[in-house]
Every structure is written in structure tokens, then in C-alpha cells.
């Protein structure tokens, strides 16, 4: 199996609604949030883990292609999802389709999803807003007892709508591969019509991929024998057609 090229997909993730990607709370703070969001430990600003993006894309594609069994991810090692997103080495689990032949492994994972960090423009907007603290707003909600109507108020931190994060996805192509880039773009489209993070059915987590650039770097690029080529600059995923893919 020989490496052929990488596709570099870059752009911005625009939060159309508030975004909540939670983190475990190790301490209780006076006036703190009941449900904090994940933050960069250095800057104390929110970011979007690459694992959150990749995991959501994979789960949506598995549902679309009927590759889910017993609630677990596909582990067959043969299908296009296993090829692009990788398959677990342990095939003994009963959750999800499993590989039946150890020689059927599809090789290295073809996708790398980097952590997405807020753009400089967004950081400045956060600083100027009196309602945003360390990149987050507090959303107050109530849980009502159906019998007594007693309210149980709580709050959640979330990244405010309109925030932008820079993203980068690398899609590799090896001998015999033909549609890795198409599968990744399909996963991104599915994600736009779903949600990222928690509380998505209550309006959180609607995102859009904007200002997308796709570059192609053949193996010769890494040997210093050739340059990269730009496949296109696109305002949105809707502008990327089959020919571009």
C-alpha cells in the first residue's frame, strides 16, 4: 500500500446557534456554571476538539450507510467508512459489525481532523461583549416536575452564535483509493444538517462550514519535487460540486 497524496481542507466553522461541548467538572465554584464547556488550558478560551467533529461525521455516515449494529461503530475493516475513519484493532467486541478476516484491514486511517480554535475576529468580538466571559455565554433553562410543577433551574455555558473557528482536515489517498474526499465532504454536509456537541435537539450546535479551501499535495510535494495545487476556494459546501470532489 503506497501513499499517493493528501487533500488539505481548511476553512471556518460558523456557529449558527449556541455551541456546547461539555467537559467534566472537577470543582464547585461560587457563581460557576452547572455545565461548563471545554477550554484551552492556556488561553482559557473555547475550542472544538477534532475528535468531536470526526466522531459526529462518522456516526452520521454510519447511519446513512446502515453500518451500525448494537449501537456500536462499524469494525469490519472493509467498508468505505472503516477505510476513511479507521477500524478498531480489537475485533472481539460484539458491538457493531466486526471484521471477519484479519487480512481485510483497510490500512492507515485516511482522515486527520485538527482541533478548531477561534478566529482572531471572534476573540475580539468576545472581548467587546459584556455578556461573554472567556468565550462563553450562560444559557438558563428550567426542568419542570410534571406533577408538582416545581422548577429546577440550571445553566449551561455555550459558545455564542456567530462565533467562528478555523478548521483543518487532512484526507490521505493510497493506492486503490478513489473517493475518500467525497466521503469526507458528504460527512461534513450531513453534519451541517445535524448538530455538533450537546443539547442539539433543543437548538444547540447548528454549524456551517464557510470559506473553504481545498489543496492537493502529491507525494512529490513531500519530497520537495513539486508544489501543491489549489482545487478551489468555496464560500460554502454547497459550492463544491461533484467535479471539484
UniProtKB/Swiss-Prot annotation:
It is an enzyme of class 3 (hydrolase). Keywords: Antiviral defense, Endonuclease, Hydrolase, Nuclease, RNA-binding. GO terms for molecular function: endonuclease activity; RNA binding. The keyword NAD does not apply. Its EC number is 3.1.-.-. Residues 88-110 are annotated as: Disordered. GO terms for biological process: defense response to virus. Part of the Csm effector complex that includes Cas10, Csm2, Csm3, Csm4 and Csm5. CRISPR (clustered regularly interspaced short palindromic repeat) is an adaptive immune system that provides protection against mobile genetic elements (viruses, transposable elements and conjugative plasmids). CRISPR clusters contain spacers, sequences complementary to antecedent mobile elements, and target invading nucleic acids. CRISPR clusters are transcribed and processed into CRISPR RNA (crRNA). PANTHER family: CRISPR SYSTEM CMS ENDORIBONUCLEASE CSM3 (PTHR35579:SF3). Belongs to the CRISPR-associated Csm3 family. Encoded in a type III-A CRISPR locus. This is CRISPR system Cms endoribonuclease Csm3. The gene is csm3.
